[in-house]
Amino acid sequence: MTIEHGLRVPMVGKPQATAAYAKEVEAAGFDFLWMPDTPLLAGLWRDVYMHLTCAALETKHIRLGPGVTNPITRLPVTVGSAIVTLNEVSEGRAELPYGSGYSSAYITGRKAASLQMMREATELWRSIFSGALTDLGGLEIELDPPHPDIPIIMAASGPRTLQLAGEIADGVLIMVGAHPGCIQWALEHVETGMARAGRDRAEVSRTLVITACVDDDRQRAIDLMRPCVGNLLRHSLVNELLDRAGLAVPKLPDNTPQPYPDLGHAVDWEEAKRVTAWIPDEVVVAMNALGSGLEVAERAAALAECDIDAIWWRDHGTWEYPNALFRGLVDEVFPKL
């Protein structure tokens, strides 16, 4: 099965540098490029839409979007305005991946969005993009011209969010690791939501978030990627996921230190590796795509068999471009698919 491939690129350096990098990513054959949206994370990240706009000006075909935005750190109407503008700059290549903001709302002292907030945001964006008369809360507008083809893609991990995505979104971004058993578990919930709304398969695209490392030194890859599993093991759904992967749930240590600003975005990755040393190798291997180019290609092929449409690839990093993963995918993985 042929699927699409995207790359996660963080906002490091100036927007002009990101634009040049996006041009390289496009030339390498990637279908989409999404950039995270956590404003001023650790004082180092910048505004995602500035970077995306510059990327749009230097590319011609690759689709662009925040990966992912949320209705908390930006008001939904502000997100809608930014995405419409990006769609105009890129001549129809904008996408709207969004989630609850669990990894970004905390920096402002707020909680992640509720399911009701995500439903309301989706309805607002769909109304705005369609050009329908839309009440923004204090003023009614009709978008001129409308942009009805911007896809609204909901990021989801838990059962209720996966079901909501299947019910109302144009696509679902599945964030449950890289084991086919976990993906099938997630898709069962997506399909429950689709059935509830009377939707068919073609109405909801399926994209996987896959954290990956292409390295012939398998143990080195495991050690590098170990922190990427840490947050998942503290999630309420860990028992179900690891059961689907045929693994036992490891015992969490008490009072584990938290790297700055958080485990998934640690400025000091060596510290992140130290505080997650308790995670067994087999869990790291199950939840990431890692190893040689052949091993990563075999994992990608197994995931494609789960009836998905795309993989959004990301590395472990936060503070630099994903150069090693980029080259590893292009040179060693994609030729084997």
What are these regions (language model features)?
Residues W34-E58, N70, Y102-S104, V176-P180, ...:
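Glycine-rich, proline-tolerant flexible connector loops at the mouths of alpha/beta enzymes
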Residues K111-L143, I183-Q184, E188-E305:
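An alpha-helical appendage that flanks or caps ligand/catalytic pockets
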Residues K14-V25, A82, A156-L164, S292-A302:
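Short, acidic/polar
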Residues V25, G29, A55, L86, ...:
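Conserved, mostly hydrophobic/aromatic
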Residues M1-T59, R63-P66, I150:
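N-terminal beta1-alpha1-beta2 module of alpha/beta enzyme domains
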